Amino acid sequence: MNIPENLQYTAEHLWVRPDENGHWLAGITDHAQDLLGDIVYVEAPKPGTRLSAGQPCGLVESVKTGSDLHAPLDGTVTAINEALQITPEEINDRPYDAWIFSFEPEHAPTGLLSAAEYRALLG
């Protein structure tokens, strides 16, 4: 299983990383996409949506099931990856390139997991 060292993670199987504009990108992990199977639909939170850490903010659906996206941190959504509306299967092919939404954190990020901590969570 692929767990890049340069990303941070949540217990709800999201990865996050800062982008060059000071916002953060969020997507689902390789583990999550593997459990879901073939992804057919992504409902990302709309730009301007207020995020509350740990609360549902979107949805990923596969041929097997649907899974809520949980906000990684408090903040505000700044953009969504429009390409995933047309080709959601990109998440299966490249989970760490296929970001779902970007957001501006309300405060300095805390409570995120390192790659080693996420790996330990998975067992």
Curated annotation (Swiss-Prot):
Pfam families to which the protein is assigned, alphabetical: GCV_H
Cofactor note: Binds 1 lipoyl cofactor covalently.
A GO CC term assigned to this protein in UniProt: cytosol
Domain Lipoyl-binding: 23-104
One of the GO biological process terms: glycine decarboxylation via glycine cleavage system
Alphabetized UniProt keyword annotations: Lipoyl
Listed InterPro entries: Biotin_lipoyl (IPR000089), GCV_H (IPR002930), GCV_H/Fam206 (IPR033753), GCV_H_sub (IPR017453), Single_hybrid_motif (IPR011053)
Sites of N6-lipoyllysine modification: 64
CDD domains: GCS_H (cd06848)
The organism's place on the tree of life at top rank: Bacteria
Cofactor(s) this protein cannot do without: (R)-lipoate
Family according to the record: Belongs to the GcvH family.
Function field: The glycine cleavage system catalyzes the degradation of glycine. The H protein shuttles the methylamine group of glycine from the P protein to the T protein.
Assembly with partners or alone: The glycine cleavage system is composed of four proteins: P, T, L and H.
PANTHER family in alphabetical order: GLYCINE CLEAVAGE SYSTEM H PROTEIN (PTHR11715), GLYCINE CLEAVAGE SYSTEM H PROTEIN-RELATED (PTHR11715:SF3)
Protein name: Glycine cleavage system H protein
The organism's taxonomic lineage, starting at the top: Bacteria, Pseudomonadati, Pseudomonadota, Betaproteobacteria, Nitrosomonadales
Gene designation per UniProt: gcvH
